[in-house]
Amino acid sequence: MTLESLTFLQPWNFVTTLHIGDDEVKIIRLEKPVSEVEGLQMVGLRKTYAILNEHDYQLAGKGAELLYWDQTTRYCGCCGSPTRWMTDISKRCPECGKEWWPSVSTAIIVRITRETPDGSSILLVHAKNFRRPYHGLVAGFLETGESLEQCVEREVREETGLQIKNLRYFASQPWPYPFGLMVGFTADYAGGEVHLQKEELSQGGWFTRNNMPPIPDKASIARQLIDDWLEQGE
């Protein structure tokens, strides 16, 4: 489908063209939602995970991130002049020459498990900002001057009061809500009692494989980490 074939969606604002491998993707911002157009439906980015393949979902996510970034970088943060696109993923201020690139907010997420004579269990928590009543994993944003490993240990300590050991990298995932990168880890319980950070968490505790609460959707790295642990017990 070409941009020219979508003229019936106008008015729109053309933002940029992405070149990813052999793909050329046009990023546009519609002036108003599409309604009652045969064969087309407006769908939120999160819902597209169940519709698109992984490759196309990542393309859509990158497009959404750039739309957000374009909206928030229309003016130079140094001199206040309007910015102009320099490449397909960067801008430049024509007055002071400052170059602007998308900033990614890095966050960690960690699966903590412990082994007891009764078997294996996983630490799951419910954050107050969750929109649904599921339990996820300890997570938090990387702070200036921190390593990823230091961030994991700090977030676990602040949110749960626990000590961990055997910290291992698991995987990472772009998280375009609006411009994040989730870096996943696994760790073993090393000591302490669970004391939840009440400002951020409403519930939390240890769960076994046969006593699991609702967990996040498959689109998230949290679910990948949890499913990996569940599969180890099969």
Segments predicted by a language model, with ranges:
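Nudix hydrolase/Nudix homology domain
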Residues: 1-73, 131-135, 197-234
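Short acidic-hydrophobic surface loop/beta-edge motif
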Residues: 16-21, 91-93, 110-112, 174-175
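Active-site-adjacent beta-strand/loop module that shapes the phosphate/pyrophosphate-binding cleft
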Residues: 28, 173-196
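Acidic, metal-coordinating catalytic segment for phosphate/diphosphate chemistry
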Residues: 59-109
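N-terminal strand-loop-strand
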Residues: 87-136, 141, 163-164, 187-189
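Active-site proximal loops enriched in glycine and acidic residues that flank catalytic Cys/His/Asp
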Residues: 126-127, 139, 168-173, 189, ...
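The catalytic Nudix box helix
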Residues: 136-171, 185, 193
